[in-house]
Amino acid sequence: MKRILVFLLAVAFVHALERGRDYEKDKVCKDLASLGREDFTSLSMVLYSRKFPSGTFEQISHLVNEVVSLTVTCCAEGADPDCYDNRTSALSDKSCESNSPFPVHPGTPECCTHEGLEKKLCMAALKHQPQEFPTYVEPTNDEICEAFRKDPKDFADRFMYEYSINYGQAPLTLLVGYTKSYLSMVGSCCTSPNPTVCFLKERLQLKHFSLLTIMTNRICSQYAAYGKEKSRLSHLIKFAQKVPTAHLEDVLPLAEDITTILSKCCDSVSEDCIKELPEYAVKLCDNLSTKNSKFKDCCQEKTPMEIFVCAYFMPASPNPELPDVKLPMNKDVCDEGNTKVLDQYIFELSRKTQIPEVFLTKILESTLKSLDECCHSESSTACLNAKGPQLTRELSSFIQKGQELCADYSENTFTEYKKKLAERLRGKFPDATETDLQELVAKRSDFASKCCSVNSPPLYCNSEIDAEINTLQS
């Protein structure tokens, strides 16, 4: 662990390099000296793979080589005082060339219209959208060792690249720590007399680390997609659907706490930050274990992290018989200092409504935006009274269509779901050919498999929901 901590000292280098601030040069050079060239290169591979997940291995490698060369040259004794600034400027200029060997970003052309420090700042601010569908598949033990023995450095670089582009939303401390631990395992097991036994033992040791990295990548991806306010809304909806027998006072602090943790930790390099997750799991049990039998079962897991994972994947519970929920249209919705009226409405609607969170977050964002516009109009009361019926109709229509798109999915196996879906579509389109029907079943079931579960990826599903709802209307 001490080695990992030292490894993380160089994180500041990337920020300094991208910002082009000379005052950080001394710190960069000290970090490089304490880290050594090999580990500095490894860290750069993780950082830039994470920053440019659509880049190829060759593109990331080119960039890493340039970064390492720049650092070593400009930190050498007797180096030109302008070396650092000149080389970082040249690096950003090279990124703008049409035949640049570096990874590209959709925002790169805009950055390239700027000059000097402004260009570097623009490049540094570029971020890719989260990878919502990781594709990394771990090779077999034999394949791992064959590649490792052939070229240990190439194996390490490719693993760090593959793992980082797939799980790059995990906090940097976890991502770096896990990749280093994994490579240490490979180095030990591929040179041991019995690799199979070694891998079995070492993977067991790494299980918690691996789970934590993968889980934080998932929740931080959702946070990156939603932002702080929508993330709070999303978690409130999920808790209301998972534990509909709870009260708002039970779940609202949990939704706010997890949002705060993610806002602090997803981009943090502090090791202490992620320790808040196990503490949060304990609070989950304190608030909800007596409200729901499935939650109570989750709280029987051995470790806080296992409790958190269990709660995360827990499906929505059957909703109890509840009265209809009316969209609040009085002046209380405009009280920015008191969100309880809207929070109560969101909670009541969510625990009564059987459609996935991505659907509710999508329509509620639009509804809340319309309410906010009324609150900032000349006559908020008149605006609310005028828009209220229309918003209620739109909300009801959207929920109905969402229920149609996801009908039968959560209650059945995928095979049974497809059978029921085919029956429903056959009844809805009696004149459709068998080929057309099969294509429609395949398309709709693929949509359901990605967007009809409790933790569906928001970026992907946001546009897909619109497309599928349009097919219902056509």
UniProtKB/Swiss-Prot annotation:
UniProt xrefs under SUPFAM superfamilies: Serum albumin-like
Keyword Ribonucleoprotein listed: no
Glycosylation, residue list: 86, 287
Superkingdom field: Eukaryota
Disulfide bonds: 29-75, 74-83, 96-112, 111-122, 145-190, 189-198, 220-266, 265-273, 285-299, 298-310, 334-375, 374-383, 406-452, 451-461
Domain Albumin stretches: 17-208, 209-393, 394-474
Gene Ontology CC: cytoplasm; extracellular space
Keyword annotations from UniProtKB, A to Z: Actin-binding, Disulfide bond, Glycoprotein, Repeat, Secreted, Signal, Transport, Vitamin D
GO biological process: vitamin D metabolic process
Subcellular location: Secreted
Signal peptide extent: 1-16
UniProt keyword DNA damage present: no
GO terms of molecular function: actin binding; vitamin D binding; vitamin transmembrane transporter activity
Assembly description: Associates with membrane-bound immunoglobulin on the surface of B-lymphocytes and with IgG Fc receptor on the membranes of T-lymphocytes. Interacts with LRP2; the interaction is required for renal uptake of GC in complex with 25-hydroxyvitamin D3.
Protein purpose: Involved in vitamin D transport and storage, scavenging of extracellular G-actin, enhancement of the chemotactic activity of C5 alpha for neutrophils in inflammation and macrophage activation.
Stated family: Belongs to the ALB/AFP/VDB family.
PANTHER family linked: SERUM ALBUMIN-RELATED, VITAMIN D-BINDING PROTEIN
Full protein name: Vitamin D-binding protein
Phylogenetic classification of the source organism: Eukaryota, Metazoa, Chordata, Craniata, Vertebrata
